[in-house]
Swiss-Prot record:
GO CC annotation: cytoplasm; protein-containing complex
Gene, per the UniProt record: Arhgap29
Compositional bias (Basic and acidic residues): 1124-1136
Single GO MF annotation: zinc ion binding
Biased amino acid composition, Acidic residues: 1256-1266
Protein name, per record: Rho GTPase-activating protein 29
Upper taxonomic lineage: Eukaryota, Metazoa, Chordata, Craniata, Vertebrata
Taxonomic source organism: Mus musculus
Residues recorded with modification Phosphoserine: 171, 176, 179, 190, 501, 521, 554, 920, 956, 1028, 1149, 1151
Length: 1266
């Protein structure tokens, strides 16, 4: 429509004048060109509108800068941007060029340059910039008129022709410089001339500093662009190398293909050029471009700031001298006024004296003298003020001269700095483009050579070679005999037969030319031998023949075999649920063409991750839950045919779960779940999260700086945690960053309800950390001491702490110990690369200390003492990492598996509350060969053959009792019923073994180390000891064994079978006679004092002594029973792990006939019976100090028959009766079935009476019967 109006107006002007003028002719010519080229081009109109809109925005920005900030630099920048936009518009649209428009731009530039910004304030702002605003409006009006005339077709070339040549070549960017700043033509200036030009400007320093700052920003942008470009090119080269390697391996196995050598050379050229480009990128990132330019930029910034500070100091000094000059000037004026007043007063006094009488002459003379004196003083002050003013003027002049000199020096320094920076920028720019040119030149030459080689190829040449090779009789015999497989001759309706696999395709012998696999489909009716029939099928799949996308193909997978193309009936659609295990088992096995990851079917155009390529997907028909995002998958979802994994199509790009080729397990809650739930599913008890993360970090991040300290991406960390819960072992974590993997590992350890080091061992490990701190302080104090070299006390302390830590760690369950061992070993490998990753054992201790050892969570407020324990936690982990090779022996502890008689696996209870399983004699020799230095042991235990065999027979019984006592702590009644039922079954089978042990002629010999020369004090007793039992226990002897066994199961203490060396001992008066007996591989008496407090608050159970005699007494039976509650006098020491034969002896004694027993010979128990009763929770420790003696009860004599058992007697001062399975009532053993009372306080233990000790020694020598 606009073009129609233009033509109509043009015709009216032409015919109205009668003859067309030159201007009209020119207008017509311009209009024709515009109409033909631009008016009918909508893209041109759109571009013109955008340019005009940009110009209007630049005008508004300039006006807003003037109104808001009034900063000179900002306004000049906006003006330069406006002129630059105007220049670009005129260069694009030549018809808009005009003298009026350029004149308006020059006027605007001149007005802006003429403004003195130092005089601008809020009051006179509008007056000063009035002319500038009018110039802006003039420029906008002129541009609008020219644009309107252009659109209406009234623009002629006369306005362009009137432009002088010098004006046409002038740039709008140089208008301000040419019209205002430069008095002469533009040209090259010497450095001195540049400095002189800047010295004439009052703001020369500010301009130079502003240019330096702009140069720094400009350089920063250039460096950022180059770095980003190089990173993209580096990533691209890596992908190109992978693609070239994969393609090369694919086409290398194919034979008789056209231009194969040419494409192989092209791939090699790509690989070579990619390697060269990587070297070029590394050089540019190092010393060829980035580093020199960044160094020069930093130097520029540093010197610019120093120069700016120096210039401000000089300006402040000049300002101070000018202020002092103004004050001196005001003082001079004030002194001058005072002098004038004094002088006029003196003049009036003289006149009064002349006109006065003689009588008043004396008084007037005095006044005259006084005023004359004041006048002289005022004159003197005037002279002093003048002198001070002159000095100030001199100082101002000196400061101004100094400022000028400083200004000249600063300008020279800035000019030199800018030239140096430009020189560096020039050098690195030359390096950049020269290296890129060399890279492009080599690539161009290789491409040219490949182009020339491709022109020489004769079409069909390779096919002819292929036919010649297949027609040879010798080749046919070799193929039929060695390579090709028999093919069926059954007819196919489609004309194709399915090939087996890539291995089924025939290979030609090496004597022929290099054979390549055929990529084109041959004719279906080709006839010939079996070798030819193997090639007659389709050589590529449907997706390849139709130009399908190969984006979803893995770069590492092999190419599709020639027999992959065949037809097949569609499979039955999926039911869409995760429970379709029957469908998974019943469906037909996949064909060779569909077995590979490339057979994606309808999903070949979907972007997939490396893990997604391992699956074999099909369409999902019903809604279910996505394994990647945990969202509901509607109909646009996919399901794996093998593992039944379901996810959205859009989630295939980020899927990290690999196909396990079997049904995928359900989601397992790992983070925040109980440790035993995850550990029991692993054979070694180490959670798979710990193993996966640690192995991945060791593979690629041991040298990464800040490993475990730098945080990862929160979103990616949460996604990895979700993937581990969904896929467990099948998660591919190679796509995640190392810091994300570290965050996942730390998060798992932090969210454990109970850390690896259990809550019950927290205090012992904290005490150990304090000892470590004490040893470190001593080591620092004695480091420079010469006596320390002669007496290495520190090394002994370190060894003592090492052995103590080993003993403490043995108290951990097997899964906790193995997991801690694995983690500490991994952290040790991280510390080995501390020079690269900057993470030593101290840093790792600070990070992992609060996660590996922490107190039981409470609601108490955080105090300073609790905060101080963080350092102890970090110090302990640092110690474990530093001495990991000495603390951990390198072998993992085996997992304990509980199996019932029926063959079913028993429910696994919390291993944290169970003692360690007993070790075999071989294991005791290897694991406990070293004695802790803080023990006072003197001898080692030598176990006899009888002990080892009896240990093997009674292991299952000990294990059952240990499990039962540990489960006795549980409060849930249902669990108690189930567990007791299971252990009753185990006890029945175990009792039979115990009878065999009792009947065994071999003895269980325990050696005493009471004497220092390792000689036994007494010979082994050949007769049975008398029996001391309560009444109710004696009545049970006549009952059936099953009734007794059901009751005896509850009386077994788990601690006597434990491997825990931390036991509480009695404080004896006579330390010289203390016995140190060792049973089952560890010392009973060697207990450190810091460990004694662990079991002080526990409750204890009163036990009785049972001694089976070897003869049948004929006397009556008398039994004394008493109630003995826990008090210091009867406080039992912890009984160590006893031999397995002890239990068997007690069980066998119960099953034998009754015999005569006598009254107890030690302290009487408080309880009415020997069975354990839980203490009243309301009683206090102080109340337990009372002791009540009960009368004895006479019982009819009962005979107890038992086989003779020879027992080696230990010292009576030992902590337990080792030869028989019972202990005296004065030594009740602590019970592990009841938890420790928190309100109970540790009490002192009453020392044993010396008289009672002597009496027991006498009984050892001479048996006494009642």
């Amino acid at each position: 429509m606009i073009a129609h109006k233009q033509k109509k107006a043009k015709k009216k002007r032409v015919w109205a004048s009668g003859q067309p003028s030159a201007a009209i002719t020119t207008s017509e010519m311009g209009l024709k060109s515009v109409s033909s080229s631009s008016s009918f081009d909508p893209e041109y109109i759109k571009e013109l509108v955008n340019d005009v809109r940009k110009f209007s925005h630049m005008l508004l920005y300039l006006k807003e800068a003037i109104l808001s900030d009034c900063f000179k630099e900002v306004i000049h920048i906006r003006l330069d941007e406006l002129l630059r936009v105007l220049k670009s518009i005129l260069s694009k649209h030549q018809n808009l060029s005009s003298v009026d428009l350029q004149s308006a731009a020059e006027v605007l530039t001149a007005k802006v340059k003429a403004v003195n910004f130092t005089e601008v304030n809020e009051e006179n702002k509008n007056d000063i910039f009035r002319e500038v605003f009018s110039s802006i409006e003039t420029l906008a009006f002129t541009f609008g008129n020219i644009l309107t005339n252009f659109l209406m077709g009234d623009v002629g070339s006369d306005s362009i022709l009137r432009l002088p040549i010098s004006r046409e070549s002038k740039s709008f960017e140089n208008i301000s410089v040419d019209s205002v700043d430069l008095p002469h033509e533009k040209g090259n200036f010497s450095p001195i001339e540049l400095d002189n030009l800047l010295l004439k400007n009052t703001d020369s320093i500010e301009l130079a500093l502003s240019y330096a700052k702009t140069w720094s920003k400009y350089t920063k942008n250039i460096v950022s662009w180059v770095e980003k470009k190089l990173n993209l090119e580096l990533e691209s080269t890596r992908n190109i190398v992978k693609l070239a390697e994969a393609t090369r391996s694919s086409i290398g196995i194919q034979e008789f293909m056209p231009l194969q050598s040419l494409f192989t050379n092209a791939l090699l050229s790509d690989i070579h050029s990619s390697h060269l480009l990587q070297q070029t990128i590394a050089a540019l990132q190092a010393n060829k471009f980035v580093q020199p330019l960044l160094g020069r930029k930093n130097e520029m910034e540093k010197q610019r700031k120093e120069i700016k500070d120096l210039w401000k100091q000089q300006q402040n000094k000049l300002l101070e001298t000018e202020t002092a000059l103004k004050k001196a000037k005001l003082l001079c004026m004030q002194r001058q006024d005072e002098y004038e007043k004094a002088k006029s007063s003196m003049f009036r006094a003289e006149e009064e004296q002349l006109s006065s009488s003689v009588g008043l002459a004396k008084n007037l003379n005095k006044q005259l003298e006084k005023r004359r004196r004041l006048e002289e003083e005022a004159l003197q002050k005037v002279e002093e003020a003048n002198e001070h003013y002159k000095v100030c003027v001199t100082n101002v002049e000196e400061r101004r001269n100094d400022l000028e000199n400083t200004k000249r020096e600063i300008l020279t320094q800035l000019r030199t700095l800018v030239f140096q920076c430009d020189l560096t920028l020039k050098a690195v720019t030359v390096n950049l483009f020269h290296m890129q040119q060399l890279q492009a030149a080599s690539l161009a030459n290789s491409l040219q050579s490949l182009c020339d080689s491709a022109k020489l190829y004769d079409p069909g040449q390779e096919y002819s070679e292929f036919v010649k090779a297949t027609s040879s009789s010798e080749l046919e015999e070799k193929v039929d005999g060695n390579v090709n497989k028999q093919m069926t001759n059954s007819p196919q309706t489609s004309g194709y037969e399915p090939a087996d696999s890539l291995e089924d395709v025939a290979r030609l012998p090496d004597s022929c030319h290099k054979l390549e696999e055929d990529r084109c489909s041959n004719s279906a009716d080709m006839t010939g031998p079996s070798f030819v029939r193997s090639w007659k099928f389709g050589m590529f799949s449907d997706s390849e023949s139709t130009g399908g996308s190969s984006e979803s193909r893995s770069l590492d997978s092999e190419s599709i075999s020639p027999g992959d193309f065949h037809r097949k009936l569609p499979r039955t659609p999926s039911s869409g649920t995760m429970s379709s295990a029957d469908d998974l088992d019943e469906r037909e096995p996949p064909s060779p063409s569909e077995a590979g990851p490339n057979s994606l079917g309808a999903f070949k155009k979907t972007l997939m991750s490396k893990a997604a390529l391992t699956h074999k997907f099909r369409k999902l028909r019903s809604p279910t839950k996505c394994r990647d995002c945990d969202g509901i998958v509607m109909f646009p979802g996919v399901e794996c045919e093998e593992c039944l994994l379901v996810c959205h199509r859009k989630c295939l790009e980020n899927l990290v779960i690999i196909c396990g080729h079997q049904k995928l397990q359900g989601k397992m809650h790992i983070f925040g779940a109980e440790f035993i739930q995850v550990a029991k599913k692993e054979p070694d008890g180490i959670p798979f999260v710990l193993k996966i993360c640690a192995s991945e970090i060791e593979n690629r991040a041991l040298c990464l700086q800040g490993i475990y300290r730098v945080c990862g991406n929160k979103i990616k960390t949460e996604k990895l945690c979700q993937a581990l819960e969904n896929g467990m072992h099948l998660v591919d974590i190679s796509e995640f960053s190392s810091h994300d993997i570290c965050d996942v590992l730390k998060l798992y350890l932090r969210q454990l309800p109970e850390p690896f080091i259990l809550f019950r061992l927290y205090k012992e490990f904290i005490d150990l950390a304090k000892e470590i701190q004490h040893v470190n302080e001593e080591q620092e104090a004695k480091k420079d001491s010469p006596e320390d070299k002669k007496h290495p006390h520190v090394s002994i302390e370190v060894n003592r702490i090492l052995l103590k830590s080993k003993d403490l760690l043995r108290q951990l369950p097997a899964s906790h110990f193995n997991s801690l061992h694995y983690l500490i070993a991994h952290l040790r490998r991280v510390v080995d690369h501390a020079e690269e990753n900057k993470m030593n054992s101290k840093n790792l201790g600070v990070i992992f200390g609060p996660t590996l050892i922490r107190p039981r969570p409470t609601t108490a407020p955080v105090t300073i003492s609790s905060l101080a324990e963080y350092s102890n936690q970090a110090r302990l982990v640092e110690f474990l990492i530093t001495y990991s090779q000495k603390i951990f022996d390198g072998s993992l502890q085996p997992q304990a598996v509980v199996i019932s008689n029926t063959g079913a696996v028993a429910p696994q209870v919390d291993q944290g509350y169970l003692p360690k399983p007993l070790l075999s004699p071989d294991e005791r020799d290897t694991d406990h060969s070293m004695k802790p230095l803080f023990f006072s042991s003197k001898e080692d235990i030598r176990s006899s053959d009888c002990e080892s065999k009896s240990f093997e027979l009674t292991t299952s019984f000990e294990e059952s009792e240990r499990r039962q006592n540990a489960l006795g702590k549980c409060d849930a009644p249902l669990l108690d019923n189930k567990v007791h039922l299971l252990f009753d079954q185990e006890h029945e089978s175990a009792s039979q073994k115990m009878e065999d042990v009792c009947k065994s002629p071999k003895l269980l010999l325990l050696k005493s180390n009471r004497a220092a020369n390792s000689v036994q004090r007494h010979t082994p007793r050949t007769k049975m000891r008398p029996v001391s039992l309560p009444v109710d226990r004696l009545l049970l002897l006549a009952s059936s064994p099953t009734e007794r066994s059901s009751r005896d199961v509850g009386n077994v203490d788990s601690d006597k079978f434990g491997k825990n060396p931390a036991f509480e001992g009695l404080h004896r008066k006579d330390n010289s006679n203390t016995t140190r007996s060792k049973v089952n591989g560890f010392d009973q008496q060697n207990v450190q004092k810091s460990w004694d407090t662990q079991y002080v608050r526990n409750n204890f159970t009163a036990k009785t002594t049972m001694i089976v005699p070897s003869a049948y007494p004929e006397k009556g039976l008398t039994v004394n029973t008493g109630n003995n509650r826990d008090h210091p006098g009867s406080k039992a020491h912890a009984e160590p792990a006893r031999a397995a034969g002890d239990v068997s002896e007690r069980r066998s004694s119960d099953s034998c006939p009754a015999t005569a027993v006598r009254a107890p010979r030690t302290l009487q128990p408080q309880h009415w019976t020997t069975f354990y009763k839980p203490p009243n929770p309301t009683f206090s420790v102080r109340g337990t100090e009372e002791k009540t003696a009960l009368p004895s009860i006479a019982v009819p004599p009962v005979l107890v028959h038992a086989p003779q058992i020879h027992v080696t007697k230990s010292d009576p001062d030992s902590e337990a009766t080792l030869a028989c399975p019972v202990q005296t009532s004065g030594q009740p053993k602590e019970s592990s079935e009841e938890p420790a009372l928190p309100e109970g306080t540790p009490t002192c233990q009453r020392p044993r009476l010396k008289r009672m000790q002597q009496f027991e020694d006498l009984e050892d020598e001479i048996p006494q019967f009642v």
